[in-house]
Amino acid sequence: MRIQTRMGAVLAALVLCTWFLMGCSQTADALDSSASEPPVVLVIGATGRTGNSILAALGDDYRIRALVRDLDRARAKLPANVTLFLGDVRQPETLTSAFEGARFVVSAVGARFVGKGDLADPMNTTELVDYEGVKHLAGAARSAGVEHFVLVSAMGVTRLGGAHDRMDNIMHWKLKGENALRASGVPYTIVRPGGLSDEAGGTLGTLVAQGDNQGPGQTNRIDVARICVRALTDPAARNVTVEVVKDASQPVVPPDGDIFAGLKVDVP
């Protein structure tokens, strides 16, 4: 009787050990699978022309999410591999789910104008989108533990009073949005392009500079998008602000290389 009891105990122990080892194996497999999956990047402003270029530049290296205000419009415009999240940068309570699990964020959001100084949406002002909206995004990124946030701003934001400022003080509010991101504590890169064009990327020289003292100029969206994507994983781009403008004397934006080498980190 004692032998049978001991044998039963041994068998029970063996069964428990087997279950434990199988559970550990399945957990390890799940972790390995998770580790091998591409990182998640959340794109804001994805339905715009610059946002579309960013999606293309991300390619297959990332699992891509897009924060959108209109799901039907986004489904019609965006690739099928983009996971859509309904939200509005003006309403911080709508941002949480899109940011959960995101490792990177790229924002090309901006107030949209129709005509000269006329807003497409009375509530789509530069103050509410380019400042308050970016501030909300930075707060959501901080809460979610985002590793790097790339913001597309505009060249000339520190030189107020120009023609663009006649449109709802756009440069003033973009600069405040930049400063809100800097103050958030989230690692960032701020990319300030010149006037955006839709020329083919990788064909014209591009100057990547600092100081916001470049003359007026154009930048094509594809090169801006490539620079944004490169900034996500380049340590030299951490907490850096750059201006980007076409310059025939400069090299084209390469598929790899040191775009951010030697640039100065922002001073708090």
Predicted regions and their residues:
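Active-site-lining helix/loop region of Rossmann-like oxidoreductase modules
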Residues: 29, 35, 46, 118, ...
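Conserved cofactor-binding/catalytic machinery of classical short-chain dehydrogenase/reductase
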Residues: 91, 133, 177, 220-223
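Bacterial N-terminal signal peptides
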Residues: 11-22
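Bacterial N-terminal signal peptides that target proteins for export
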Residues: 2-11
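Glycine-/Pro-rich loop/turn segments that contact NAD(P) or position catalytic residues
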Residues: 111-216
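N-terminal Rossmann NAD(P)H-binding glycine-rich loop of SDR-like oxidoreductase domains
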Residues: 34-60
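Bacterial signal peptide processing site
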Residues: 25-26
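NAD(P)H-binding glycine-rich loop region in Rossmannoid oxidoreductase-like domains
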Residues: 41-42, 46, 66-143
